[in-house]
Swiss-Prot record:
NCBIfam families: PRK12494.1. It is a peripheral membrane protein. It comes from the Eukaryota. It catalyses: a plastoquinone + NADH + (n+1) H(+)(in) = a plastoquinol + NAD(+) + n H(+)(out); a plastoquinone + NADPH + (n+1) H(+)(in) = a plastoquinol + NADP(+) + n H(+)(out). NDH shuttles electrons from NAD(P)H:plastoquinone, via FMN and iron-sulfur (Fe-S) centers, to quinones in the photosynthetic chain and possibly in a chloroplast respiratory chain. The immediate electron acceptor for the enzyme in this species is believed to be plastoquinone. Couples the redox reaction to proton translocation, and thus conserves the redox energy in a proton gradient. It is found in: Plastid, Chloroplast thylakoid membrane. This is NAD(P)H-quinone oxidoreductase subunit J, chloroplastic. Pfam families: Complex1_30kDa. Its main location: plastid. One of its GO terms (cellular component) is chloroplast thylakoid membrane. It is an enzyme of class 7 (translocase).
Length: 158
């Protein structure tokens, strides 16, 4: 079954894959990393001007990493928002996805957190650096293959 967003992308010959609908009826689409930035710009122009959230997850140990974007479009009133979920999968060895910071400013800290926890590099992000972990931290703590260190010394802030 094809949703409204998928039908619109097909009409404009934009490459994607429909992953169906979640329990709330929100359509989920898969976009390739190399197509993501252009589709993000087009989605913004189409009316998806609110990035509700961005997150990431590890699909499987040794598998792909995913960056997930929840976009909202309000056309007929605030009580009837149109939402879409976009998933962009990247290989674990070199996870690179174009940043959407320049489209939706709210992606700033969210992409930084995904970088900090999963090691996904967001190309053209203006301040892509660790946000939760110390700069000296080694590894990506939320990856399924991450091995936690036995000891980590945190220096006093005073």
């Amino acid at each position: 079954m094809q949703g409204r967003s998928s039908a619109w992308l097909v009409k404009h010959e934009l490459v994607h894959r429909s992953l169906g609908f979640d329990y709330q009826g929100i359509e989920t689409l898969q976009i390739k990393p190399e197509d993501w930035y252009s589709i993000a710009v087009i989605s913004y122009v189409y009316g998806y001007n609110y990035l509700r959230s961005q997150c990431a997850y590890d699909v499987a140990p040794g598998g792909l990493l995913a960056s997930v974007y929840h976009l909202t479009r309000i056309q007929y009133g605030v009580d009837q928002p149109e939402e879409v979920c976009i998933k962009v999968f990247a290989p674990r060895g070199n996870p690179r996805i174009p940043s959407v910071f320049w489209i939706w400013k709210s992606a700033d800290f969210q992409e930084r957190e995904s970088y900090d926890m999963f090691g996904i590099s967001y190309d053209n992000h203006p301040r892509l650096k660790r946000i939760l972990m110390p700069e000296s931290w080694i590894g990506w703590p939320l990856r399924k293959d991450y091995i936690a260190p036995d000891f980590y010394e945190i220096q006093d802030a005073y």
